[in-house]
């Protein structure tokens, strides 16, 4: 008799995706982040659902409803901080997942890669709208500044901003719609993640060597299920240390002050995971130019497959490209630091240099390094 997991229509899908899936025998811990992102997403949806049961999306009560969750709701404080810090863990996993894709040439699966970019954009939009909901000072001013960037769009800019606001400033209508979008988008992310996996399973996983692994596959369960559980437990450990020991480490103290349209905070800055893009935005003196650079800083990922000049897939055996990759990582860390600094000398210059280097590395230096490596190997 055929095993039920192979015969039942629903079990068959789960079986072919998580149990009998043939996986390369040599994938490292860098391949754990896909499943960790799934864990993060489920955690965010569950904690978010419980928060939404007590939150009120109204300018007069939003801030106090969050206070009420933390003070009066049973275990409300831990749900709130797991949701806030869960977002940070989500982005850490996202950046490492994308970094792994860049390093090992996973972008050579174009459908999987492009859906991944759409997922990244959607997640960033969701996180931005979630940050507005507590209606603190940084929520309000962050929403005002970031939505205002759309006014840089020629001709229709102002109308576009007022359409998104639902009025002439960030107000009740803005908060209500942001809450609606913040609630629905994670489910769209869930659907996109399923499509992401669907395309990945069409080709099979890449592996650190970049060499086709069809001749050496092992079943996903138990080898990688146990590895994923270890990863999830490690993630849970880091998250709970953050939540229980320093829940406000990654937040902004200004957000503990209720939103006040009459008082601007001295330094308006987004959450830490947007700082690199914010630094690129600020490094260009022109408004429209800054907005374009901001969008391109993420959208540049879409043309990475076109810039692949190497005869090898990954960077495992390419020391020159490895040096440039880690320079890119250092550059992104520099941009993240600059994004959180005030707009004054020497930070302006450092930000501009780091922004130029970011685009130079991806568009010029890395493709050239690949060509040099090909020639050195006489390929």
UniProtKB/Swiss-Prot annotation:
One CC-aspect GO term: respiratory chain complex III
Main localisation: mitochondrion
Disulfide bonds: none
Gene Ontology biological-process entries: mitochondrial electron transport, ubiquinol to cytochrome c
Keywords from the named record: Electron transport, Heme, Iron, Membrane, Metal-binding, Mitochondrion, Mitochondrion inner membrane, Respiratory chain, Transmembrane, Transmembrane helix, Transport, Ubiquinone
MF terms (GO), sorted A to Z: metal ion binding; ubiquinol-cytochrome-c reductase activity
Transmembrane segments: 33-53, 77-98, 113-133, 178-198, 226-246, 288-308, 320-340, 347-367
Annotated positions binding a ubiquinone: 201
Cofactor(s) needed by this chain: heme b
Binding site for heme b b562: 83, 182
One Pfam family, short name: Cytochrom_B_C
Residues reported in the UniProt entry to bind heme b b566: 97, 196
InterPro entries xrefs: Cyt_b/b6_C, Cyt_b/b6_C_sf, Cyt_b/b6_N, Cytb/b6-like_sf, Cytochrome_b, Cytochrome_b_C_euk/bac, Cytochrome_b_N_euk/bac, Di-haem_cyt_TM
Annotated localization: Mitochondrion inner membrane
PROSITE patterns associated with the record: CYTB_CTER, CYTB_NTER
Keyword Nucleotidyltransferase set for record: no
Iron keyword on record: yes
Cofactor binding mode and count: Binds 2 heme b groups non-covalently.
Bilayer disposition of the protein: Multi-pass membrane protein
Complex and partners: The cytochrome bc1 complex contains 11 subunits: 3 respiratory subunits (MT-CYB, CYC1 and UQCRFS1), 2 core proteins (UQCRC1 and UQCRC2) and 6 low-molecular weight proteins (UQCRH/QCR6, UQCRB/QCR7, UQCRQ/QCR8, UQCR10/QCR9, UQCR11/QCR10 and a cleavage product of UQCRFS1). This cytochrome bc1 complex then forms a dimer.
Family label: Belongs to the cytochrome b family.
Function: Component of the ubiquinol-cytochrome c reductase complex (complex III or cytochrome b-c1 complex) that is part of the mitochondrial respiratory chain. The b-c1 complex mediates electron transfer from ubiquinol to cytochrome c. Contributes to the generation of a proton gradient across the mitochondrial membrane that is then used for ATP synthesis.
Something else known: Heme 1 (or BL or b562) is low-potential and absorbs at about 562 nm, and heme 2 (or BH or b566) is high-potential and absorbs at about 566 nm.
Protein name per the record: Cytochrome b
Species this protein is from: Aonyx capensis (African clawless otter)
